[in-house]
Amino acid sequence: MMIPNVFWLVPIASIVALAMAYYFFTQMMKADEGTPRMKEIALYVRKGAMAYLKQQYKVVGIVFAVLCVLFAFMAYGLNVQNPWVPFAFLTGGFFSGLAGFFGMKTATYASARTANAARESLDAGLKIAFRSGAVMGLTVVGLGLLDIAIWFVVLNHFDADGLISITTTMLTFGMGASCQALFARVGGGIYTKAADVGADIVGKVEADIPEDDPRNPATIADNVGDVAGMGADLYESYCGSVLSTAALGAAAFGVAGLEVQLRAVIAPMLIAAVGVFLSLLGIFLVRTKEGATMRDLLRSLSVGTNVSAVLIAAATFAILYLLGIENWLGLSFSVISGLAAGVIIGQATEYYTSHSYKPTQQISEAGQTGAATVIIKGIGTGMISTCIPVITIGVAIMLSYLCANGFDLSMSSESLAHGLYGIGIAAVGMLSTLGITLATDAYGPIADNAGGNAEMSSLGEEVRHRTDALDALGNTTAATGKGFAIGSAALTALALLASYIEEIKIAMTRANVAMENLQGEVISAADANIPDFMNFFQVNLMNPKVLVGAFIGAMAAFLFCGMTMEAVGRAAEKMVQEVRRQFREIAGILEGTGTPDYGRCVEISTRAAQHEMIIPSVLAIIIPIIVGCVLGVAGVLGLLVGGLAGGFTLAVFMANAGGAWDNAKKNIEEGAFGGKGSFAHKACIVGDTVGDPFKDTSGPSLNILIKLMSMVSIVMAGLTVAFM
């Protein structure tokens, strides 16, 4: 089929994004890294980060090789899968890993330069940190769109089975991206939080030395940063939303003719492409003045993200109108509902996690009565904070569904297909400005490490005050970014849920399985619609298979969190023992005359991350396969719904509780309730330490878990049908 000329905007946007990422990277590298001591600290961190990545990619490479052989056997041996799946799976993982590598590399080069720029002014420090974060944001969208464009062109040339086959095949590279993202997020979270928790317990609580003090042997491993896995995480959300919406578009507009169907398929790709250019505009708008307050800093970032969001909303109307898609106006409002949901969730997260607002201030106040009340208050705040995001996502789902199908509540096959396409379009809308929203997220670890470098390099009080301001902002932007990632994951997972039915349809058609439609007539699977499938597989709440699947899905979220939390705990115990040993055996560390063995702590974190990440990550792959083989399609749909509902709510709770504990401690360090060294400060350090794996390991990993279970179900649909 002929690809419309307007499609080529997609690869052009990807090249522009990658070119601008390279430009921002070179601009950052031209900045001075500072004093010899600052360069030395940065080199330690860089070596630790690269050692971790090298080990992680070895482990992930083995897992990918095993899965690729399995998919090749399913495709060419059992003939229950499209023959392109093994290759799509590999490219998804490769590009996702590449995004993570560039993000980590940029972050480790940017931290010392940010600290050095902060010696000049707050604005100079903000610009370097934020534009270094933009390198990751633009790399993710650039590589994502490039991968999508290449596969669309290749499959359009070689796959003659039509757009539904092409788009569902493209979806499978999302599983490669999801697998890589989960390993990166879980492994990176265990690595950095084992070091962080260990450094806090022995350094701040026992030895009473400040955070990021060079006398603490674990401080270098801690400063490798939370950026590990962040790029890979949102890469798979971004690709998943675009690809699932393209697949839903092919299904929804299949009866309208090939040309209309093709326009519906490329619409989400074009919205994402235009989002690249508007994200760039927002990035250039971010700046601040010397002596800026936390609210001023937040406002400067909000200007960039909000301008990009407003412009993409306007651009969507033009794109859908010019494509001539039926009900273009309703679909445009679906996009706006997704964008609005992203903004509202971000603002709600900021309210519950920034120490400019009451919830976090109350946690700081609770520190006056001890660590127990800090923990209780933080858990309560995290639980209450789930209310607004859950309601917001619920409203966004309903609005995007109804706007896309013309407010048709009949649940006919046509209105259902168009409504589901609207939900997918809403997810694309939320992620269309990822270039700038991921920049604000990645900015957090860079600012954090800049503060660590300033502390370890003994820079002046004024510089440390500036890096503290950037770091506190980074905690809030990181929490806001996590809220955004969780919200987009929920919409993407729902779109993937609908795409699963399309993949089952293709698998049944390939296996020549006949079925009964709603009227009781025997028809081929190729002629069936979504209501027919729901009836055929008895997908309703009275079917015990659906209920059992839903319970397993909800349990999987808690099981996964429990395993990752325990992994951090075990690794942190080893780190605590090592730091205590060094304090005991290496003379002069606490006096500042002896040099700690930083490398040993980096080695402990690296080894723990590689060992501990395997079981939770593999579990996420195995559960949907077992449920599919035992409980069938109805059980899998229950599993995905239960995993989505439980995982989304739990992820919001963990991210917000962790962010609130962190900023409650920062609030006291700025002078509230007795300041540094006070009883309240020590109580809040305990809360912050508990919150570390909440917000940086288990919580963010849940986003990937709920999407990976959907992706695995889609890829394994042929196997599920074979066991019917």
Locations of the language-model features?
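Hydrophobic packing and interface segments
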Residues: 1-724
